[in-house]
Amino acid sequence: MSERFCIALDAMGGDHAPDMVVAGADIARERCPNVDYLFVGDEERIRPLLDKYPALAAVSTVRHTPDAVAGDAKPSVALRTGRNSSMRLAIDAVAAGDAACVVSAGNTGALMAMAKFVLKTLPGIDRPAIASFFPTLRGESVMLDLGANLECDADNLVQFAVMGTVFSRTVLGLLEPTVGLLNVGSEEQKGHGSIRQAASALRASALAKNFRGFVEGNDIAAGTVDVIVTDGFSGNIALKTAEGTAKLYAEFLKRTFKSSLLAKLGYLLAHGAFQKLRLRTDPRRYNGAMFLGLRGVCVKSHGGTDAVGFANAIGVASDLVVHGFNEKIRDELARLQAALEAAALSPESTEAAAV
């Protein structure tokens, strides 16, 4: 997509909204020159902020609403009472065709509930999944689900594998991303029934040549595969564990380099290397979790991020629109279904069924 398109922004979602949202959009404006912005929220607070960024204001409109979804609101309550909230109206803009996608740093559960209710799921997708990036020794990988579905059956996991593959191709530019199912061991007999059934289905699918079987927790950071598929329960624990471990080692380094004069001197000598490491592991670089499987593009920013992180979330949304992400998911699902039907009609499968 080379023509201009609009991104709807939940201007009141996040710990530092609307300041962070407006400042982030201005940063993203340079990266995404073909984008217009629809800010949804309290116009009295948004307009003065836009006045600070004339170039952004020139490509922006504001849709006023005084209501916002509270960060601690239950999804069911937000869905029932938040019809006029900035989050809901931003999603409505996508459903109405006024925007190509929506970005919000608001309540994750509420955003998922509203997006699924308003936008619905793509044909062939039973449940949407949350996907995001992980830094690895080999670059970056994609992991899903990160919390939308605590329990998943084999069909859900296969659908996640398809969506993760398309996401990796679209955003990371990998032609043949490898896929693995997160499990408690790499042996075929390990894991519960659903994950073993999913593995069997993937081996018989159009993704078979890139499916690497089961991967374990230590394979995430190693970058053993490009796409890691799991249920939302395990995925969310893995995500939070990785975030906590990164903070732990950052604190360890800080304390170590403050421990003595010689340690401080060592830090000064290695300052350039540590700056590269800091940039490589900066969580703002990986901000922007995608709700995959919906009929519209919906990206969730971390609620506590700053303008740089929010700009990256906008960049993810823009990439998905530009590369026709949802259309590619539809094509991949159709190809997968055709391969499964062909396998079912093959002489080998017919003979096996007869036996």
Curated annotation (Swiss-Prot):
A GO CC term assigned to this protein in UniProt: cytoplasm
Gene3D superfamilies, alphabetized: Isopropylmalate Dehydrogenase
E.C. code: 2.3.1.274
Location, primary (coarse class): cytoplasm
Protein localization: Cytoplasm
Pathway(s) this gene product operates in, as recorded in its UniProt entry: Lipid metabolism; phospholipid metabolism
Subunit structure of this chain's protein: Homodimer. Probably interacts with PlsY.
Any one of the GO BP annotations: phospholipid biosynthetic process
Protein's UniProt keywords contain Cell division: no
Top-rank EC class of the record's enzyme: transferase
Record-given protein name: Phosphate acyltransferase
GO MF, one annotated term: phosphate:acyl-[acyl carrier protein] acyltransferase activity
Similarity-based family: Belongs to the PlsX family.
Catalyzed reactions per annotation: a fatty acyl-[ACP] + phosphate = an acyl phosphate + holo-[ACP]
Function, in words: Catalyzes the reversible formation of acyl-phosphate (acyl-PO(4)) from acyl-[acyl-carrier-protein] (acyl-ACP). This enzyme utilizes acyl-ACP as fatty acyl donor, but not acyl-CoA.
Keywords of this entry: Cytoplasm, Lipid biosynthesis, Lipid metabolism, Phospholipid biosynthesis, Phospholipid metabolism, Transferase
InterPro entries (UniProt xref): FA_synthesis, Phospholipid_synth_PlsX-like
PANTHER family found in the cross-reference section: FATTY ACID/PHOSPHOLIPID SYNTHESIS PROTEIN PLSX, PHOSPHATE ACYLTRANSFERASE
